Amino acid sequence: MSEFWLCFNCCIAEQPQPRRRRIDRSMIGEPTNFVHTAHVGSGDLFSGMNSVSSIQNQMQSKGGYGGGMPANVQMQLVDTKAG
């Protein structure tokens, strides 16, 4: 006994992908609240943790990073086991 497959393309309509809206330069505005704090290159990040720490200290010394407010947060841990 053999199997016979027949595909009817007329019955299966592929849904067209929604068109993505093209963005041009006129649709992009100027940055807001931008503060330039440091130059970081790929070599800086791969040179070790001392360099990363140095970059973090440099950025914090520029200001704008100490404005956080303390908050008490309570979270409940739920242990889920696959079974």
Swiss-Prot record:
Residues 28-41 form the CRIB domain. GO terms for cellular component: cell projection; cytoplasm; cytoskeleton; phagocytic cup; plasma membrane. Signal peptide: none annotated. The modification Phosphoserine is found at S42, S51. It is a lipid-anchor. Disulfide bonds: none annotated. It is found in: Cytoplasm, Cytoskeleton; Cell membrane; Cell projection, Phagocytic cup. A lipid is attached at C10, C11 (S-palmitoyl cysteine). It comes from the Eukaryota. InterPro entries: CRIB_dom (IPR000095), CRIB_dom_sf (IPR036936), SPEC (IPR039056). Keywords: Cell membrane, Cell projection, Cell shape, Cytoplasm, Cytoskeleton, Lipoprotein, Membrane, Palmitate, Phagocytosis, Phosphoprotein. Interacts with CDC42 (in GTP-bound form). Interacts weakly with RAC1 and not at all with RHOA. The CRIB domain mediates interaction with CDC42. This is CDC42 small effector protein 2. It comes from Rattus norvegicus.
